Amino acid sequence: MAAIELIDLKKNYGPVSAVKGINLTVADGEMIVLVGPSGCGKSTLLRMIAGLEAISSGHLRIAGSDVGHVDPADRNIAMVFQNYALYPHMTVRQNLEYGLKNRRVARGEIERRIANAASILEIGEFLERRPRQLSGGQRQRVAMGRAIVRDPAAFLFDEPLSNLDAKLRVQMRVEIRRLQRQLKTTSLYVTHDQLEAMTLADRLVVMNGGRIEQIGTPIEVYRRPETVFVAGFIGSPPMNLIDLDQLGPCQLALPRDTDVIGIRPSAINLGSGSAHDLRFDAFVELIETVGDENNVHLRIDGADKRVVASISTNQPLQEGDRISCHVGMDGLHPFNRATGRRTD
């Protein structure tokens, strides 16, 4: 196990800057999840750490050693890919032992590591099968097993669950988190799926346009997004972002330079509320039922602005209703549009 340090790490493709000066420290044994939309630079950054992409400038340290120009095989890290990357003509056992044989690990040690990985991942009964005889989830377990037997300083996960169906993704997500906590191996995990990110991470790193927007625990990032981008990206349904001038005259005690407020759908309540609340009337345009809640799509009365509210299915609402809504001051997130940042 080892800490990973990224110091002003940059990646350029000719005149295009894909990764723009990343500074990040992953503590020994920590699980960091890089999350962001397609093209934000998260996978490029992971490949730079793995050694699959050259670093344009900056420093990469693993366990205190600068490895930015060290061959990938010598960085003592293991990577788990989206497409499993298993050899189809080999059995599971042969896939697990292949890298160890190439590094001339002793036969007894190879057997010990394979037995340990098979026990942890519950794949012992599959050791003599070939990948085509396994389900998607079983293949992903084998891919993780191949990483475990290397006994690396760190794991790198590149969207490993993207090829699985929804039910299996949930199951494998739990298994990856359990495995990481059991092994206490420093881990970096890349995903565009915010639910995956929120449930797996010790800390989230939200990326956008090759830069870090915010670093924090999942609950910190959710409860206090530092930028307009993070506010609109983290959360499902996403946070409603409303320009103050779309609300008309209102008496709210907001920080100076606030011209945008963010409101979580769960913070919108039915009824007129109190004089200190943000209050508005709205028309119900669409109701989406998702379990115990409805995602209610509203058009604010007198404004060309639509918002989404998460309302209990016990509330008798119908499309076409005109309703009164309120949001307490603790449910308002103040931002400045020009800077893109919080004002409080």
Swiss-Prot record:
Annotated source species: Rhizobium johnstonii (strain DSM 114642 / LMG 32736 / 3841)
Gene3D superfamilies: 2.40.50.100, Nucleic acid-binding proteins (2.40.50.140), P-loop containing nucleotide triphosphate hydrolases (3.40.50.300)
Gene this chain is encoded by: ugpC2
Any one GO molecular function term: ATP hydrolysis activity
Name of the protein this chain belongs to: sn-glycerol-3-phosphate import ATP-binding protein UgpC 2
Family: Belongs to the ABC transporter superfamily. sn-glycerol-3-phosphate importer (TC 3.A.1.1.3) family.
GO biological process, alphabetically ordered: carbohydrate transport; glycerophosphodiester transmembrane transport
EC number: 7.6.2.10
Assembly behavior: The complex is composed of two ATP-binding proteins (UgpC), two transmembrane proteins (UgpA and UgpE) and a solute-binding protein (UgpB).
Top enzyme category: translocase
Residues where ATP binds: 36-43
